[in-house]
Amino acid sequence: MPNDKLILLIQGKVLPEHRAELLQTIRETLPLTRAETGVELLYPTTRKDDPNTVVFFEVFSSQDAYDSHMQQEYVKRFFATIQGGLVGEPVVTTLSELS
């Protein structure tokens, strides 16, 4: 039986002057995202050795659930908020669950 889950590890370096705004935006959108159908896990963290590096661990039940998530207005606002607040592009790694 194939596993259709989409598992992502996303890491981005935040410009220090944008850190407070980004963290506030994460706090505002987190409960909305976790309540979405198909969002199995969304866990935002920062690196202990670099608090300006934000790392998200995300698990969606399927690609469709992820696509639906990305269409939510609060997700679009999140990305608009972080525009210009990161050092470069985030690194997105797609993972596979061990069976």
Predicted segments with their positions:
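An amphipathic, aromatic/His-enriched active-site/gating alpha helix that lines ligand/cofactor pockets
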Residues: P31-E40, V59-T93
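Short alpha-helical
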Residues: E17, E28, D49-P51, E73
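N-terminal first-folded block
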Residues: N3-A35
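Residue-level detection of beta-strand scaffold positions
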Residues: R19, L23-R27, V54, A65, ...
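Short hydrophobic/aromatic segments of transmembrane alpha-helices and their interfaces
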Residues: P2-N3, Q24, K48-D49, E58, ...
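Short, well-ordered beta-strand segments in beta-rich or mixed alpha/beta enzyme
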Residues: L6-K13, Y43-M70
